[in-house]
A protein has these predicted regions:
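Conserved active-site alpha-helix within GNAT-family acetyltransferase domains
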Residues: 105, 109, 129-147
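Conserved beta-strand in the GNAT
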Residues: 57, 63-72, 88, 93
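A short beta-loop-alpha structural element at the N-terminal edge
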Residues: 1-15, 24
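A conserved beta-turn-beta hairpin within the catalytic core of GNAT-like acetyltransferases
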Residues: 74-89, 99, 146-147
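A short helix-loop-beta-strand connector motif used in the catalytic cores of GNAT acetyltransferases and
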Residues: 42-57
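Conserved GNAT acetyl-CoA-binding A-motif
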Residues: 115-126
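Conserved acetyl-CoA-binding loop-helix of GNAT-fold acetyltransferases
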Residues: 91-94, 100-113, 140
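Conserved GNAT-fold acetyl-CoA-binding loop/helix
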Residues: 22-44
Length: 154
């Protein structure tokens, strides 16, 4: 079952976010800081209480096994771009014990239905190139690559 996170869920949500952070530190130690300090932990409250953001959790048998931090984005038309309304996934995590058991797919199906209810036109996310298993999953459920960020190290 997917539902909105509550304050009682914050400890488990942050445990999942910590797992994501560790993956990113391992993949790009030149970009991400090791550890999961209080500021990162408190950010969950900001998302949960935000006007245009939420934290979703997947609960099975009373256990939170996955989560997603999402934003509801409405960008106005500009001289160089069209107006856009979309669902943005900031973070998504499945507890390592529950991976490959349909948790992420369940989250995605909820997000699709929720985005449609909110009259949002699409779901966007970004993923680091080192995260090959996530890329494989996103492609398998229908995400398409729309832009590529590159860097040139000096």
């Amino acid at each position: 079952m997917v539902r909105l996170a509550t304050e009682k869920d914050i400890e488990k949500v942050n445990d999942l976010r910590r797992q994501v952070n560790e993956l990113h530190v391992k993949g790009r130690p030149d970009v991400f800081k090791a550890g999961f300090g209080q500021e990162l932990q408190d950010f969950a409250y900001t998302l949960m209480n935000g006007e245009n953001s939420d934290i979703l959790v997947v609960e099975r048998d009373g256990v939170i096994c996955g989560m997603a931090c999402v934003d509801y984005v409405c960008k106005p038309e500009t001289p160089y771009g069209m107006a856009r309304q979309f669902y943005h996934v900031q973070e998504i995590a499945v507890d390592e014990v529950f991976r490959r058991q349909g948790v992420a797919r369940e989250l995605f199906e909820f997000m699709k239905a929720d985005a449609e209810k909110r009259s949002l036109s699409k779901i966007e996310l970004d993923v680091w190139a080192f995260n090959e298993s996530a890329i494989e999953f996103y492609e398998a459920i229908g995400f398409k690559e729309t832009r590529i960020w590159m860097e040139y190290k000096l």
